[in-house]
Every structure is written in C-alpha cells, then in structure tokens.
Amino acid sequence: MSNRFAVILAAGKGTRMKSKLYKVLHPVCGKPMVQHVVDQVSQLGLQKLVTVVGHGAEMVQEQLGNVSEFALQAEQLGTAHAVDQAASVLANEEGTTLVICGDTPLITAETMEALLQQHKEAGAMATVLTAYIEEPAGYGRIVRNENGHVEKIVEHKDANEKELAIKEINTGTYCFDNKALFASLSKVSNDNVQGEYYLPDVIEILKNEGHIVSAYQTEQFDETLGVNDRVALSQAEIIMKNRINRKNMVNGVTIIDPSNTYISADAVIGSDTVLHPGTIIEGNTVIGSDCEIGPHTVIRDSEIGDRTTIRQSTVHDSKLGTEVSVGPFAHIRPDSVIGDEVRVGNFVEIKKTVFGNRSKASHLSYIGDAQVGEDVNLGCGSITVNYDGKNKFKTVIGNGVFIGCNSNLVAPVTVEDGAYVAAGSTITENVPSKALSVARARQVNKEDYVDQLLNKKKS
C-alpha cells in the first residue's frame, strides 16, 4: 500500500453559526466536529495528518493535541489556498492525499477507505467522493464521460439544463496523487467573482492534462453533511444520535425510547443494560452489563460496574462498583469512588469521597471530602461538615460505623471502626472504636408549660 496522507480543512470563520465558538469545535453528540473527523481518518493508516487552521487555531490545536500536525491559513482565500498551506509538510511526499472538511462529523472511515480503494483501482490522479440525491439544487454536478470517469464538476449556477438534471453531486471530499495535487495548486487561478482559489479547479487542471479523474459514489449521503449553521448542526446531532443508539442496540443494549436517549460517541455500554427515556450518557463513560439506567439520568465521564441501578440521578467523573443502587434524585459529584453493593438513596449528595462496600446513605445526606469504610450506615440527614468558609477538611468514617439520623460530623474528624453516633449529634471530636458518642443537649420536659404560656397571653 502506498503512503497515505490527509489534510483536514478547518480554517473557515463559520460566520453562519453566529457563535463565539470556533465552528469545527461545536460538539455533535458531545464531541467536537473536527475530533469526529480526526478519529475516523486516523483509522486509515496515515503516514501524516495535517489540519489547516485559521480563526481559533490555538483552540483547535489544544483539542487535537499531537494527533495532527498543523498549518496556518492566516487569510481565508479559498479551499485550494487552504490545502496549499500544508505544502511545507506534504509537497515532497510520494503517495495519496485525502482532503476533507473539518465540519463533516458524520463521515466514516469505511467510506473514506472505499474512496481510496476506488482511487487506486482506477489509476486516477484525483478521485471525488460523490452522492446521488433527488433534490440536488445548490450542489456541484458530476459530469461523467463514456468511461465512467469524471469529465468535469459543474457548479449549480453554471449548469445548463442537461447538467441540472444530473443528480450525482460533489460532496467536497477528494483524494489525490500527492505530488500532482501540490503541482496543480500553483496553477489554480482566483479569477472568479469571490476572488478565491477553489480546490475543484484542481480537478479540471488534472483532466486537461490528460489524467484520469475518478469518482466514488457513496450510498450514505448523510455522511457527507457539512455543518455550516445551527440547523445543520441539529441535523448532524440527530443522525449521529441515531447511529450511536442503533450500534448499541445491535450490541445488546436495550434502549426503551431511542428518540429520548442520548449517548456520546465515546461511551461504552455492556450487554443487557437497559436505558430508560431521558437518559444522557456523556463523555468517556463506561457502563457494565445488566445495569438499569434512568429514567432522566445524566452520567458523564464515569465508570459504572455491572448490575448497577441509577434512577433519576446525576453521576459526574466518578467510579461506581457492582450492584450499586443510586437514586432517585441522588447526585454523585466528581472524584467519588463508590464500592460494591452500596446504596445511595434519594436526595443524597456525594462529593470527592471514597464510599466503602455495602455501606448505605439512604436519604437526605451530604457526604463530601470523606473516606467512608465498609458496612457503614449513614442515617437520614447525616452531614459531613467539610467547609469552614475558607478551607475544606476531611471526614474519616471507619468500618461498621452507625451514624444516627440528623447528625453533623464537623471535619476534620474521625469516627473509628464499630462506633455509634447517636441521632441528632454534632460531632466535633474523634470517636473511639466501638464507642457510643452522644453530642446533644439533654432533653428537658417542662410540665404544664403550655397552659402557663397561654394563660399569660390572655392576661
């Protein structure tokens, strides 16, 4: 196989997005558009990948990191001019170069591989990715010769009646013989209304020089969708969501209502897990097998063990073990590690806490900056008081501890193994192992007090 290279065009202003965010960084199913493209082209066995950046260059470079080399198009003078900015990296290379836009998040490695194979088999200097659509208005038409090769690409506004009837359109993705590409770029003129250098002109240059220009027609027109405004962004979101949901269902995940279930492109979900409506799985989340998630649950960048149930709750940047029960209406905040067979009940918030196996906080509790041992019971209304207005402090609860209802543990404080804390206590000092700690005022009953009070008000 000859050397392969790719150029991703990501320098456009994206003015139609009407956004402060650089266009190709707008997310589709939780991942920036350009990252979708890079992830797919990276599966093609490339020797070099160059992303052409312009506005917001630093943000794109930060997003892609060292996966790609970068070329700067400081002034946007057209697509041919954009590709030419990669000359310092690629111009002297032998091989085939794929050129694709960074705002086509739905393109797949399979389609690009088919394009490259068609290019090779046809012995072409350039190959165009095309698609057949019933309503081709606005698209450039593909005019083929008697051999089935591309004779020319005609823009809609320049097409005659016969050419307007053609329904095979140019999608804007190409592959070229690398040296022929960069040799032709220097011949492209900007003698047009916009005064720009257009990449399709390279096709005409190569054709006029007697080279074969081939085309590969994809049956997946949706993959070629370019996102230029918020309407197209929403269309891409729907298509990607359906693709992701279908893939998960085919792999053994039950999605009760796919139209109301959102799964990120990078999420991994085990078989026989059930997702109820309103479930949102974001980021690099991994969910095990035989889980039940939702309804109305958000999980982001977290790891969920097998046979875990999460109902109407939120989990962020945390790890949950096996056979955990969460919710309804619980919130597990970042940097929490929940053990196996744990119960986190309704209106419980856990933050930056290690919560041991078989421990329970069944309702109305806040556990923050804490280390909770195994087999611990935190009664209703248990609070770790971790913040003094300036600094956060740690609470340590040993194994087998029982915390009574409506108790405050004022950090820094340790409750050692097997200790009991009486309901209503405010603990400010360490509790020894197996001790009962009572930290509340003794109850006083004042006999006949109510009658005395009422008589006083009457007088």
UniProtKB/Swiss-Prot annotation:
Residues 231-251 are annotated as: Linker. Its cofactor is Mg(2+). Acetyl-CoA binds at N386, Y387, A423, R440. UDP-N-acetyl-alpha-D-glucosamine binds at residues 9-12, 23, 73, 78-79, 140, 155, 170, 228, 333, 351, 366, 377. Mg(2+) binds at D103, N228. It catalyses: alpha-D-glucosamine 1-phosphate + acetyl-CoA = N-acetyl-alpha-D-glucosamine 1-phosphate + CoA + H(+); N-acetyl-alpha-D-glucosamine 1-phosphate + UTP + H(+) = UDP-N-acetyl-alpha-D-glucosamine + diphosphate. Its EC number is 2.7.7.23, 2.3.1.157. It comes from the Bacteria. Residues 1-230 are annotated as: Pyrophosphorylase. One of its GO terms (molecular function) is glucosamine-1-phosphate N-acetyltransferase activity. The keyword Repeat applies. Residues 252-459 are annotated as: N-acetyltransferase. InterPro entries: Bifunctional_GlmU, GlmU-like, GlmU_C_LbH, Hexapep, Hexapep_transf_CS, NTP_transferase_dom, Nucleotide-diphossugar_trans, Trimer_LpxA-like_sf. GO terms for cellular component: cytoplasm; membrane. The keyword Acyltransferase applies. Pfam families: Hexapep, NTP_transferase. GO terms for biological process: cell morphogenesis; cell wall organization; lipid A biosynthetic process; peptidoglycan biosynthetic process; regulation of cell shape; UDP-N-acetylglucosamine biosynthetic process. Its main location: cytoplasm. Keywords: Acyltransferase, Cell shape, Cell wall biogenesis/degradation, Cytoplasm, Magnesium, Metal-binding, Multifunctional enzyme, Nucleotidyltransferase, Peptidoglycan synthesis, Repeat, Transferase. Pathway: Nucleotide-sugar biosynthesis; UDP-N-acetyl-alpha-D-glucosamine biosynthesis; N-acetyl-alpha-D-glucosamine 1-phosphate from alpha-D-glucosamine 6-phosphate (route II): step 2/2; Nucleotide-sugar biosynthesis; UDP-N-acetyl-alpha-D-glucosamine biosynthesis; UDP-N-acetyl-alpha-D-glucosamine from N-acetyl-alpha-D-glucosamine 1-phosphate: step 1/1; Bacterial outer membrane biogenesis; LPS lipid A biosynthesis. Coiled coil: none annotated. The active site is at H363. This is Bifunctional protein GlmU. Catalyzes the last two sequential reactions in the de novo biosynthetic pathway for UDP-N-acetylglucosamine (UDP-GlcNAc). The C-terminal domain catalyzes the transfer of acetyl group from acetyl coenzyme A to glucosamine-1-phosphate (GlcN-1-P) to produce N-acetylglucosamine-1-phosphate (GlcNAc-1-P), which is converted into UDP-GlcNAc by the transfer of uridine 5-monophosphate (from uridine 5-triphosphate), a reaction catalyzed by the N-terminal domain. Homotrimer.
